[in-house]
Amino acid sequence: MSLLWQARFFTTVNHLRDLPNTQVPEIAFAGRSNAGKSTAINILSNQKKLCFASKTPGRTQHINYFSIGGAHVGQHRKDETKVEEIRAMLVDLPGYGYAEVSGSAKHHWQALLGDYVQRREQLAALVLIVDSRRPFTDLDIQMLEWFAPTGKPIHCILTKSDKLNRNESTNALRTANTLLASYVDEYGQPFPFTAQLFSALKRTGIDEANDKILELLGLNDEVSEESDSKTAGDAEKAE
């Protein structure tokens, strides 16, 4: 069972001043509206309704936090989250790319999103959700360029890969890796950017994404320790 299955709603904020003062690592999910961000979060957390997608793309301009740890697994549990036991946060950022919002709302969203990804110290990495059929729009590039100067990792999940044939999938991943490799720091060293294919329908790429997210949150060692402990316990019972 993945640690991500422990995810449960923690809080929603509309201003930077309202961000939680927790000190655990955060990993943020960003992406164009309708790229499959909510679906990816729900599948990775093994919960159908953890993250809701707005019926009107581009309408949700809040930042939603989901805690890992501090409570029993599953949204149906009514027990209170123990903040001191939270180990990490999944952060759902507003989807971007639609014009159905007013100019003032769009400006507020851009300021909120830009300030969060550039200044939030607790932010360990960014997961960029990109439709594999329409990879890296201008707004996706803008997000990359907002975040790159932080030097923190970006993992790109190329969704809806089931809509592509094998050659198209290979080309989409190659294109993504080539683009990401073009981002280098002042010393010419590439930023820690990675990419993978993902399909909610075919349920492919889930384990790869899960392992990468836990690695970026620094929780993969805990998973290994728990696995080793379980293996040792099973061995003792067998004896």
Swiss-Prot record:
Binding-site positions, GTP: 31-38, 58-62, 92-95, 159-162, 193-200
Superkingdom: Bacteria
Binding site for Mg(2+): 38, 60
Keyword Chaperone recorded: no
Cofactor: Mg(2+)
Keyword Cytoplasm in annotation: no
Segments forming domain EngB-type G: 23-219
Key words of the record: Cell cycle, Cell division, GTP-binding, Magnesium, Metal-binding, Nucleotide-binding, Septation
GO BP terms: division septum assembly
GO molecular function: GTP binding; metal ion binding
Job of this protein: Necessary for normal cell division and for the maintenance of normal septation.
Family assignment from sequence similarity: Belongs to the TRAFAC class TrmE-Era-EngA-EngB-Septin-like GTPase superfamily. EngB GTPase family.
The protein's name in its UniProt record: Probable GTP-binding protein EngB
